[in-house]
From Swiss-Prot:
It can also use Fe(2+). Belongs to the hyi family. InterPro entries: Sugar_Epim/Isomerase (IPR050417), Xyl_isomerase-like_sf (IPR036237), Xyl_isomerase-like_TIM-brl (IPR013022). Mn(2+) binds at E147, D180, H206, E241. Strongly inhibited by Co(2+) and Ni(2+), and slightly inhibited by EDTA. Coiled coil: none annotated. This is L-ribulose 3-epimerase. SUPFAM superfamilies: Xylose isomerase-like (SSF51658). Keywords: Isomerase, Manganese, Metal-binding. The keyword Transport does not apply. It holds the Pfam family AP_endonuc_2.
Length: 297
């Protein structure tokens, strides 16, 4: 059964303990099954206390990051690449210690606009580094899920097909795709077909609107997306992601160009998203049942 989650920045960008606890309480109140924490620094957090609170509320947890430029594992600078591996290993440990089993986000290269096309050497350095991190993650009971993002946030992996090729080159069975409807709407020729093509290798999904606001108010064909996820038998985690200038994280807001205030009432946004995703999945399942029913007299 799919767990429906929510990105922590819908609630707060702070790592203060009181804010983290409020984030968890809001997540449960809005009806979600999972919280996705992003850019959570273990040095700032009571990990044991947070893990207990997550468990007490019956929530799942995932951790997402975007590698910084000075931690780009595809870099030819060995110190920079080594820092990236260190960040990834720390994130794996954090995920394990919080009781999670998925690391997601931009793991293959530095997050941000690149002014040059990627090189084969860059690709090879990244696949080799992630293959090693994936083994560490596997021992910790954690999977790596590569977010496929638009060309303005990475030059390495922009389509699901590129992600599949990348995973194949790592040789790892512990690396999967993290698909995001916002990014797919920009880069994929057909989002539904891309999902079908990636069947069996999808490990995590972000559900977000074309303008990153309320679901259903942009131009994304969510019915086609839910139909495709149902068709490939995806029954794993989906998390709602939305950003507004109402809640700003300096590390992420500039890289993702969050200039407009698309919402102010985050609880209304979250409850709407939970209902929208739940109904979308249920509708897709019911349609699949109808088209497969033979109805013999």
């Amino acid at each position: 059964m799919a767990r429906i989650g929510i990105h922590s920045f819908v609630w707060s960008a702070s790592s203060a303990q009181s804010e983290l606890e409020r984030t968890l309480a809001n997540t449960r109140e809005a009806g979600f099954d999972l919280i996705e924490f992003s850019y959570l620094d273990p040095a700032d957090v009571d990990i044991g206390g947070l893990a207990k609170r997550i468990a007490d509320l019956g929530l799942g947890v995932a951790i997402s990051i975007g590698l910084p430029g000075d931690g780009d594992i595809s870099s030819a600078d060995k110190a920079v690449a080594a820092r990236g591996v260190e960040i990834l290993n720390e994130t794996v440990a954090l995920t394990r210690d919080l009781g999670g089993r998925k690391v997601a986000g931009i793991l293959s290269a530095g997050h941000g606009l690149q002014l040059e096309a990627p090189t084969r050497d860059q690709w090879s350095r990244s696949t080799a580094a992630l293959a090693k991190v994936a083994e560490t993650a596997k021992a910790a009971g954690v999977t790596l899920n590569l977010e496929i993002v638009n060309r303005f946030e990475s030059n390495l992996l922009n389509t699901a097909a590129q992600g599949l090729a990348f995973i194949e080159d790592t040789g790892s069975d512990n690396i999967f795709l993290h698909l995001d409807t916002f990014h797919m709407n920009i880069e994929e020729a057909d989002v539904g077909l891309a999902i079908r093509h990636a069947a069996g290798k999808i490990g995590y999904v972000h559900i977000g609107e074309s303008h990153r606001g309320f679901l259903g108010t942009g131009n994304i064909d969510f019915a086609a997306i839910f139909d495709a996820l149902t068709a490939v038998g995806y029954a794993d985690d989906l998390s709602f992601e939305s950003f507004s200038s109402e809640i700003v994280d300096e590390n992420l807001s500039k890289k993702t160009a969050i200039w407009r205030n698309l919402w102010a009432d985050n609880m209304a946004l979250a409850k709407h998203a939970r209902a929208f995703i739940g109904l979308g999945l249920e509708t897709a399942r019911r349609k699949a049942e109808l088209v497969s029913a033979r109805h013999k007299p």
